[in-house]
């Protein structure tokens, strides 16, 4: 008897429809995340006509917009991008926590994968590192996660 292993890959998601929900706040970082996500999707065969970018004011608003996009447009995956940078007040914890929790709920309630590409960092330097310099581009990583999940979910039940 052989154990069946089901994994996603980056090829099956090329024909899928993707929604990218982007928080505008901290745009100097977020625009690099968006470029990374778009580049990753293009490199894996996703046509620009299959990608729609939606812009929310900030990270706190991303979950509601992602939920409405999921319900109204039925993409195969949502890619959430934003940046929450810690300051001197508890604001960071509220925004970062609610954004993460909200996006998890959107995914579970809609049945549509939501890739989490929202940076939650302690400093501007960390944000810059994670948006295309030393630590890679977390926007590209979120796009790859979305591609993989689309392919994986296509195989569930086969």
From Swiss-Prot:
SUPFAM superfamilies: Lumazine synthase. GO terms for molecular function: 6,7-dimethyl-8-ribityllumazine synthase activity. Pathway: Cofactor biosynthesis; riboflavin biosynthesis; riboflavin from 2-hydroxy-3-oxobutyl phosphate and 5-amino-6-(D-ribitylamino)uracil: step 1/2. GO terms for biological process: riboflavin biosynthetic process. GO terms for cellular component: cytosol; riboflavin synthase complex. Catalyzes the formation of 6,7-dimethyl-8-ribityllumazine by condensation of 5-amino-6-(D-ribitylamino)uracil with 3,4-dihydroxy-2-butanone 4-phosphate. This is the penultimate step in the biosynthesis of riboflavin. Keywords: Riboflavin biosynthesis, Transferase. It comes from Hahella chejuensis (strain KCTC 2396). Forms an icosahedral capsid composed of 60 subunits, arranged as a dodecamer of pentamers. (2S)-2-hydroxy-3-oxobutyl phosphate binds at residues 88-89, 130. This is 6,7-dimethyl-8-ribityllumazine synthase. Its EC number is 2.5.1.78. 5-amino-6-(D-ribitylamino)uracil binds at residues 25, 59-61, 83-85, 116. PANTHER family: 6,7-DIMETHYL-8-RIBITYLLUMAZINE SYNTHASE (PTHR21058:SF0), 6,7-DIMETHYL-8-RIBITYLLUMAZINE SYNTHASE DMRL SYNTHASE LUMAZINE SYNTHASE (PTHR21058). Pfam families: DMRL_synthase. Belongs to the DMRL synthase family. It is an enzyme of class 2 (transferase). It catalyses: (2S)-2-hydroxy-3-oxobutyl phosphate + 5-amino-6-(D-ribitylamino)uracil = 6,7-dimethyl-8-(1-D-ribityl)lumazine + phosphate + 2 H2O + H(+). The active site is at 91 (proton donor).
